[in-house]
């Protein structure tokens, strides 16, 4: 099993004691605070807390706004703290999202490409801050324009003095500043932003990192994310997603497309595989079990490559992902939920994920 966080204690507490802390009430805003406990080989014991607040609008035309605080610390004196807001205006005409984070947290590195061997595993610790702000403006109906800016400033410390990341041959091995300007368009007619049951989501976003934007590196990226939701009745839904990422220019190693996260290609350690380009697709079946408790089953696959044409090559390696999960709805009149997913990837890799709201 790869070194993915395993917050078992949190998963148990979420599924056994959440209802009492999120009891239904008539106020427009709901808040909950939960403990965090986990472990990983590179961190030892992890502990902390998260606070989540959702404001439910009084009209159906306005989508709910949220805010989250998260803090964790580990037995090896590593830490992560972030604040995140997602604010919708009346009628969902404007949307503003912001994220601010400081971390000193280890991540694995195996090299580049889909053939990076397990034996090449080493760890590096980025220390610093990252932040982003995205503005979304409705043009007409479900069509939005999207613009934003992202910035990070990290110092990277490799775990091994003789490892690959100790060599300046790998771009970005010492860290540095990355500033990116983002522009895009979005079609979004989903019925709910937390756990959609019908509708579609299609977003194309281009980003450019360059010196005028505060970046030490010059590269560009195009991300296309498409989702569709098919209602099957009685609280059941089939969710579909396809994602493509293409990167050009001189991108540092930590800005490449990565396999392994809590949203798609679950079951791999974060960054287990990385390259310039990525294509992935997944399907997820979601259903209600009992009252606020639900379950999900998902399967997907993806590829990474140094250029787009290689993604379609017959000899390219396909990375599988599949698993099951539980869901607990937080509030009686909202679909916001806590999800606990167990996923498996290729070659015996697996991971347990605890997160707010659906993966997509």
Question: What do the predicted segments below correspond to?
Answer:
Residues 1-5:
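N-terminal secretory signal peptides that target proteins for export/translocation
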Residues 7-19:
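Bacterial N-terminal signal peptides
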Residues 20-24:
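Sec/Tat signal peptide C-region and signal peptidase I cleavage site
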Residues 25-30, 57-64, 90-95, 140-142, ...:
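Short loop/turn motifs that connect adjacent beta-strands in outer-membrane beta-barrel proteins
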Residues 26-33, 39-177, 272-275, 336-339, ...:
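Gram-negative/organellar outer-membrane beta-barrel architecture
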Residues 82, 169-171, 179-308, 312:
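C-terminal outer-membrane beta-barrel translocator/porin domains of Gram-negative envelope proteins
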Residues 182-185, 323-333, 349-360:
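Outer-membrane beta-barrel "beta-signal"
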Residues 283, 300, 326, 340, ...:
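Hydrophobic, well-ordered secondary-structure elements that form the walls
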